[in-house]
From Swiss-Prot:
InterPro entries: Haem_peroxidase (IPR002016), Haem_peroxidase_sf (IPR010255), Peroxidase_pln (IPR000823), Peroxidases_AS (IPR019794), Peroxidases_heam-ligand_BS (IPR019793), Secretory_peroxidase (IPR033905). Heme b binds at H193. The keyword Oxidoreductase applies. Residues 1-25 form the signal peptide. The active site is at H67. It catalyses: 2 a phenolic donor + H2O2 = 2 a phenolic radical donor + 2 H2O. Keywords: Disulfide bond, Heme, Hydrogen peroxide, Iron, Metal-binding, Oxidoreductase, Peroxidase, Secreted, Signal. Disulfide bonds join C36-C115, C69-C74, C121-C321, C200-C232. Its main location: secreted. This is Peroxidase 45.
Amino acid sequence: MEKNTSQTIFSNFFLLLLLSSCVSAQLRTGFYQNSCPNVETIVRNAVRQKFQQTFVTAPATLRLFFHDCFVRGCDASIMIASPSERDHPDDMSLAGDGFDTVVKAKQAVDSNPNCRNKVSCADILALATREVVVLTGGPSYPVELGRRDGRISTKASVQSQLPQPEFNLNQLNGMFSRHGLSQTDMIALSGAHTIGFAHCGKMSKRIYNFSPTTRIDPSINRGYVVQLKQMCPIGVDVRIAINMDPTSPRTFDNAYFKNLQQGKGLFTSDQILFTDQRSRSTVNSFANSEGAFRQAFITAITKLGRVGVLTGNAGEIRRDCSRVN
């Protein structure tokens, strides 16, 4: 009896290991080596050209990748035109330059006869994300490929799937852990806010109406409050965009974490990473060592790129990223 029980436990353990490695085994670097060997160069050139037109290309593409992966997995469902995920309020603020970056890169890839209709929009978005990180001074990293494009994109599927500006650490960890991402991964990915921007309407409560007894969030730097009030005065258009990193907003560096140490996190969900003792040591580590942040970011963005992917014969290779075939 004990022997059979041991065999069953071992079999179940082996099955779990097999399932957990399944996605990463199907995604791999060099996936298009035979079908479209120059895909990475083609995407790189297209993204660089778009980036030269507007810096917004970088934060917009990064945010687009994150939003895509957290809703139905990294399947480019965010790219599908309305009615779709893009109709949800959490996605309506996504900058058009992110979508345009993927469209331009897809056009460049498909203009090569050897590559036409062979590379998924999901993979192009993953590659474009790496390129904007590099273009802003961040680390380069190998991108696993082999994703297929999803056929489903609905407004309802976005509900409660994306982190909110007022989230506390428990809420952040809970949401990220559902996708196999650790607290360290979450903090590293939050570091991408170093080149991010946000709209006045998303943070004004912290500086004008934080609580019934306290107008200003006590965790926010008072000098930073003055700056924010100048950029987002009462009555301003809530869509006005401001940088999330007030020191080096166009450079992918560890300044975001140094800002948190000074109380200069734009969102509650940013500043909580430092004010909560459970995550403070990681923030301090990344603030003290850009190398530590860069390595953690590479690990986290790679894991993010594996979330909910479609591979093999699942999904499709979309001819037009904005609509299913």
